[in-house]
Amino acid sequence: MEFVILDLEWNGTYSKRKSGFFNEIIEFGAVKVNDRLCVEDTFSVVVKPQIGKKLSSKVKNLTNISSEELGLGVTYTRAVSKFKKFLGNAVLMTWGTSDILALMENHQYYWGTDRLDYIEGYVNLQSFCERVYYERGKQMGLSTAAQLLGIDVQGMEHHRALDDSLLALACFRRLYDEEELKPFFEDASKNQFYDKMRFKTTILCDLSNPLLKDADMSFECPACGAEAKRNGEWEFKNKSYRADFRCPCCGGEFKGRIQFKLKYEGVVVKKTTARKEEEPAGEMAAAEEADG
């Protein structure tokens, strides 16, 4: 079995055809490895923009891709053709789903369908790595994962597609376990895969929603582990509910914060606690930026 870890860079631009903003892919970077995670080949292609004429200042600063590089790039359709050959029958991996969604968006623009017929097997590498290093309330970025795993990133160009794919590989190597990886395989030839990718995560903000359970609203005391009692009503703020709690066993008081996200798989409950004199840390707000 072979794996291809893909990273993309794209530029947010306005599309007249779509009458809206569009994430135009400007660079492909990928690394192919065998079942021992030894590198077999790498892939790097810059795409000449055909929708937006200028890169946003944010993309310029992040990627350092020059106008000269873009001018020498290939068309998007040519880039995809090259990547198809590179991918072959390998299992595709990306860090999170944003790259897959960008591929689907660009495929829809150029071919009229968002189905990626050249992808058979898929693994969300971010989800796989989070099973070990999981911080409650937020997704793990690639740089954070590398830092937690003690990976030396010197000499790598962050936010360049090939280097980011190699960094993702380094994380994968540290955590690889053949048996533990199996549950993360997805069949990208099935309708269910695209239904899942298209599903928009939403924040549930009605406590009477039948999808929510009473047990989800309980908190354990962070000091002694006993079930705490809520003091007062729930307050909804910054996309989450919060309330004061007191432990009947040790008398400890703390603030509890809870967020409900409706994902394709169902409701995901995320909780944080903090001492009463503190505000709960802003993990959940940060998660909103890239959660899917």
Segments predicted by a language model, with ranges:
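Metal-dependent phosphoesterase core characteristic of DEDDh/y 3'-5' exonuclease domains
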Residues: 21-26, 32-63, 84-204
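Alpha-helix initiation/capping motif
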Residues: 19, 69-72, 135
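Metal-dependent phosphoesterase signature
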Residues: 61-79
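A broad, low-specificity signal marking well-ordered, structured residues that form hydrophobic/aromatic
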Residues: 3-4, 43, 219, 245
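Entry/capping segment at the start of metal-dependent catalytic domains
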Residues: 1-27, 31-36
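Acidic two-metal-ion nuclease catalytic site recognized across multiple nuclease folds
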Residues: 174-292
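Short, well-ordered turn and helix-capping elements at secondary-structure junctions
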Residues: 10-12, 49, 129, 232-234
